[in-house]
């Protein structure tokens, strides 16, 4: 019985490369001369450092641009609040989201059941397994999910016949 998994996962290697490119651009840009602006990464947590709110916005824009160039969807980023650290300096923690959340998984299952396509959906951890008897049904399910779920980037992998 053909099946595939619906997941939501950023390519962390590309995220790391985008951070390195962002730091390189920040270190060479004229408007950041003499400032302590940078992006640091610990696992799935990115920390943006800057001298003030304006420069923090600039750092964020550089990072988003580099992520977009490396085909990493910016909807994976979950921004924390801006915190003041010593003096005028500020930092912001950005989390890279992973996995299909419980609410989104339920929404996907509901969409699949309401679509009247002859497939079954089951929640398996942080993924949703879609299985059906015909490959065409699975492909139409993928098209329907791409159209209807716009708030979170979805990937479709583990396609089996």
UniProtKB/Swiss-Prot annotation:
Pfam families: DUF520. The keyword Nucleotide-binding applies. GO terms for molecular function: nucleotide binding. The keyword Coiled coil does not apply. Keywords: Nucleotide-binding. GO terms for cellular component: cytosol. It comes from the Bacteria. Belongs to the YajQ family. Nucleotide-binding protein. This is Nucleotide-binding protein Bcen2424_2555. It comes from Burkholderia cenocepacia (strain HI2424). The lineage of its organism: Bacteria, Pseudomonadati, Pseudomonadota, Betaproteobacteria, Burkholderiales.
